[in-house]
């Protein structure tokens, strides 16, 4: 069984036991649980339910894993004929979630 969830404005396809990488979660410490109630669709084994936009009474419980940073992205700004250039680096924080259960199915 799988579910399509929306979390922080992005959509993810999850199954029980799978892990996903989302933008940083600073509200919950690693090892804690979160419940995602924005479930767009569930399906599998002859069962398909589609919400409009979300399903009522269905949720996904996930365990918060490690927080880590992505590889560095280098942004280079340049203006011709003005002797202006600037290099900026950025590393985004991410959190790994492990889906423990799909609730309300």
Curated annotation (Swiss-Prot):
The record's gene field reads rplU
Q: Which domain of life does the protein's organism represent?
A: Bacteria
Q: Which residues form a coiled coil?
A: none
- Show the InterPro entries listed in the entry: bL21-like (IPR028909), bL21-like_sf (IPR036164), Ribosomal_bL21 (IPR001787), Ribosomal_bL21_CS (IPR018258)
Q: What is the originating organism of this protein? A: Treponema pallidum (strain Nichols)
* General function of this protein: This protein binds to 23S rRNA in the presence of protein L20.
Q: Known HAMAP family for this protein?
A: Ribosomal_bL21
Alphabetical UniProt keywords: Ribonucleoprotein, Ribosomal protein, RNA-binding, rRNA-binding
Q: Which Pfam families match?
A: Ribosomal_L21p
Q: Which GO terms describe its biological process?
A: translation
Assembly and interaction partners: Part of the 50S ribosomal subunit. Contacts protein L20.
So what family is this one in? Belongs to the bacterial ribosomal protein bL21 family.
Give Gene Ontology CC terms: cytoplasm; ribonucleoprotein complex; ribosome
Output this protein's name: Large ribosomal subunit protein bL21
Q: Which GO terms describe its molecular function?
A: rRNA binding; structural constituent of ribosome
């Amino acid at each position: 069984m799988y579910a399509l969830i929306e979390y922080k404005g992005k959509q993810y396809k999850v199954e029980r036991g799978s892990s996903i990488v989302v933008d940083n979660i600073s509200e919950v410490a690693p090892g804690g649980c979160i419940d995602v109630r924005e479930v767009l669709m569930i399906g599998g084994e002859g069962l398909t339910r589609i919400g409009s936009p979300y399903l009522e009474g269905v949720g996904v419980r996930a365990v918060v894993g490690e927080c880590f940073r992505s590889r560095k992205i280098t942004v280079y700004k340049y203006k011709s004929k003005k002797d202006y250039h600037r290099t900026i680096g950025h590393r985004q924080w991410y959190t790994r979630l492990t889906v423990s259960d799909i609730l309300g199915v």
